[in-house]
A protein has these predicted regions:
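Conserved glycine-rich cofactor-binding loop
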Residues: 11-13
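Substrate-binding pocket helix/loop in short-chain dehydrogenase/reductase
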Residues: 89-90, 97-101
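Active-site loop of short-chain dehydrogenase/reductase
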Residues: 74-76, 89, 120-133, 166-169
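A short, exposed helix-loop element centered on a Lys and neighboring polar residues
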Residues: 113-114, 158
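Catalytic loop of short-chain dehydrogenase/reductase
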Residues: 127-152, 157-158, 162-165
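C-terminal helical subdomain
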Residues: 166-178, 189-234
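The beta1-alpha1 cofactor-binding region of Rossmann-like NAD(H)/NADP(H)-dependent oxidoreductases
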Residues: 53-64, 95
Length: 234
């Protein structure tokens, strides 16, 4: 049976690596982002689909899943990778920018999870994955908006895992504790004479972890996995 996957908040890093690894195994993959022009090369590479969606809009998220239904049916796995980022001194933050960041990270995660859960409950199971960050468990100075959103997303995953796990829907949260070596990042410019594996997470390695959790037997499901470079302090 062909695996069907929907990756929301798709880009060039860990989400692209997950799309590639799934496609290599014969999966059908749909990619969702606000700007799908940036996904053209990846879509063609994996033979997948690209759907435009603003995850903060109820109607757009509902339409995303309707389009996915029409293209390939109910996804077996949904990865929520979208995230908002705003930082700065608390006295200087733009409230509207903070609101948008929270909507994208937390509320968008809820909307996508709700649509995924409706379908997976009807089909008898599935997996809903979420990409977190160091800020999911630790609030740093001047990073209040990012931590607020990621804390909310983590709380969502814990609640969903307890509600949906007994109904055969695997909910997992991945804490990416460090910087990702996404294409286009120049490590030599940032940290000269540094081995990238010492300071950044490789997107392909993150994707391998997603796949490993996806393939877990339900007698031994992970709810949360944290990933970091081997020399990262924590």
């Amino acid at each position: 049976m062909t695996l069907k996957a929907l990756i929301v908040g798709a880009g060039s890093g860990n989400s692209a690596s997950f799309a590639r690894i799934l496609a290599r195994q014969g999966a059908q993959v749909a990619l969702a982002a606000r700007n799908i022009e940036k996904l053209a090369d990846l879509k063609n590479e994996i033979g997948g689909y690209a759907i435009s969606c603003d995850v903060t809009e109820v109607d757009q998220v509902a339409n995303l899943f309707l389009q996915t239904d029409a293209i390939m049916g109910t996804p077996d796995v949904v990865l929520y990778n979208a995230s908002g980022f705003t930082s700065g001194p608390i006295a200087e933050l733009d409230p509207l920018a903070v609101q948008q960041s929270l909507m994208l990270t937390g509320y968008g995660g809820f909307l996508v999870a709700q649509q995924a859960a409706k379908r997976m409950l009807a089909s008898g199971g599935g997996a809903i994955f979420f990409t977190g960050a160091t800020a999911s468990i630790k609030g740093f100075p001047q990073f209040a908006p990012f931590a607020m959103g990621k804390f909310a997303l983590r709380g969502l995953t814990q609640s969903l895992a307890r509600e949906l796990g007994p109904l055969n829907i695997h909910v997992a949260h991945f804490i990416i504790d460090g910087s990702i070596a996404s294409p286009g990042r120049d490590l030599n410019a940032e940290k000269p004479s540094t081995n990238i594996d010492d300071v950044m997470l490789e997107p392909d390695a993150i994707a391998e972890t997603y796949l490993s959790v996806l393939n877990q037997h339900r007698s031994a499901w992970s709810q949360e996995v944290d990933l970091r470079p081997w020399k990262e302090s924590f």
